[in-house]
Regions:
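N-terminal topogenic module of multi-pass integral membrane proteins
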Residues: 1-57, 185
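Residues within membrane-spanning alpha-helices of integral membrane proteins
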Residues: 8, 29-39, 90-94, 113, ...
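Hydrophobic cores of alpha-helical transmembrane segments in multi-pass inner/ER membrane proteins
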Residues: 8-20, 64-79, 118-125, 166-183
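Aromatic-anchored segments of alpha-helical transmembrane domains
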Residues: 36-44, 93-105, 140-153
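Membrane-interface helix caps and helix-loop-helix hairpins in membrane proteins
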Residues: 50-54, 101-112, 153-160
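Membrane-proximal helix-loop-helix units in multi-pass membrane proteins
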Residues: 57-126
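C-terminal transmembrane-bundle signature of multipass membrane proteins
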Residues: 129-185
Length: 185
């Protein structure tokens, strides 16, 4: 089993637990569900059980264009209907995902990266301004994940760029999930 399968498995566990957690707002659960779908397909791909790179890429793209903005909404507008009602969270995810698909079809490849980066940067700024240490560490972890992956950083032959993405996303989403759960309680 290669390192990508292991790190994607960790991301799958974290995102799946958030997605099924009844104490989380719908917006973070939908975002986590999209990330979990990509991670599940990544595990299947990287273990060789079901190598479907296009499906993994598709759901990763949905994560970038729909899940990251939805995650930002969870914290930027935590009291809104968009963050707290399934109907509006779902509509937002579908529209954001559709925009991502259109951008992909038009070969506007930077769209997904730009949306993810802007969403995560907004999370970082909001967390710093509100002096929320847990959310800040989580948001900075997500920012680290996006930046290291975009820069194609690897560590010798041990960790590939995707490994850093998976590890820092798992850490960031876990911490942000914990923060969202604490706020809801």
């Amino acid at each position: 089993m290669n390192s990508l399968a292991i790190t994607d498995s960790l991301l799958l566990v974290v995102t799946f637990l958030i997605a099924i957690g009844a104490k989380y707002p719908p917006s973070i659960r939908i975002a986590a569900g999209l990330f979990a779908a990509a991670a599940c397909l990544g595990v299947l791909r990287f273990t060789g059980v079901l190598p479907l790179p296009t499906m993994h890429s598709f759901f990763s793209g949905l994560g970038a264009t729909a899940a990251y903005p939805l995650l930002a909404v969870t914290f930027l507008f935590s009291g809104s209907v968009l963050a707290n009602q399934w109907r509006f969270s779902s509509i937002f995810a579908v529209i954001a995902g559709a925009l991502g698909l259109v951008a992909s079809a038009l070969e506007f490849g930077i769209w997904g990266n730009a949306v993810a980066l802007i969403s995560v940067a907004a999370l970082v700024l909001r967390s710093i301004i509100s002096r929320d240490v847990l959310a800040t560490v989580g948001a900075v972890s997500l920012l680290t994940a996006v930046v290291l992956f975009a820069l194609n950083v690897s560590f010798a032959s041990l960790l590939k760029p995707g490994d850093f993405l998976h590890l820092f996303m798992a850490l960031g989403l876990g911490l942000l999930g914990l923060r969202a759960r604490v706020k809801m309680a």
